[in-house]
Amino acid sequence: MAASRSSITTLLLLIVAVALGYGILPISAKTSVARQLREQVDFVDAAALSESATSSSSSSALDHKSSAPGEATNASETEHSAASTASEPKHEGPTMMSFVGPAAAGVLAILLIGAVIAFKKRMNK
């Protein structure tokens, strides 16, 4: 009886140590497919906006001889770079706190299962 309790306790401590060990290691988050598609759509929209801005500014440059064509290109490039930097959110990897909740829930679940098993064994005697 004492041997089974010590083996269960050892097993629980081993599981907790492994869970906490993996929680401390830095893990890089991979970008999801949905985020990649959203960024691609934003990029295509920004490219279409800059293209339409270039065509409208070049047509207005043809109408007005005073404006230089290089200024219109620089303006559209500035708009495109501003749009692309504004649409890209800054993502950091997961933090330690993002692992504490699931690790605690797992430990509590294991303890609850162990308590139920111990209770059933005690009731069968």
Curated annotation (Swiss-Prot):
Compartment list: Secreted; Host cell membrane
Signal peptide (from-to): 1-21
Main location: secreted
Transmembrane segments: 99-119
Bias (Low complexity): 51-87
Membrane topology (UniProt): Single-pass membrane protein
Keyword Zinc annotated: no
Stated induction or repression of this protein's expression: Expression is up-regulated at later stages of infection.
Keyword annotations from UniProtKB, A to Z: Glycoprotein, Host cell membrane, Host membrane, Membrane, Secreted, Signal, Transmembrane, Transmembrane helix, Virulence
Motif (RxLR): 35-38
Region (Disordered): 51-96
GO cellular component: extracellular region; host cell plasma membrane; membrane
Positions annotated as glycosylated: N74
Swiss-Prot/TrEMBL domain comment: Has a conserved RxLR motif that acts to carry the protein into the host cell cytoplasm. Lacks the 'so-called' EER motif, which is found closely behind the RxLR motif in most of RxLR effector family members, but the presence of an EER motif is not always essential for the translocation of every RxLR effector into host cells, or for inducing a hypersensitive response.
Primary role: Effector that acts as a broad suppressor of cell death to interrupt plant immunity. Inhibits cell death induced by cell death-inducing proteins, including the PAMP elicitor INF1 from P.infestans.
Protein known as: Secreted RxLR effector protein 55
Organism: Plasmopara viticola
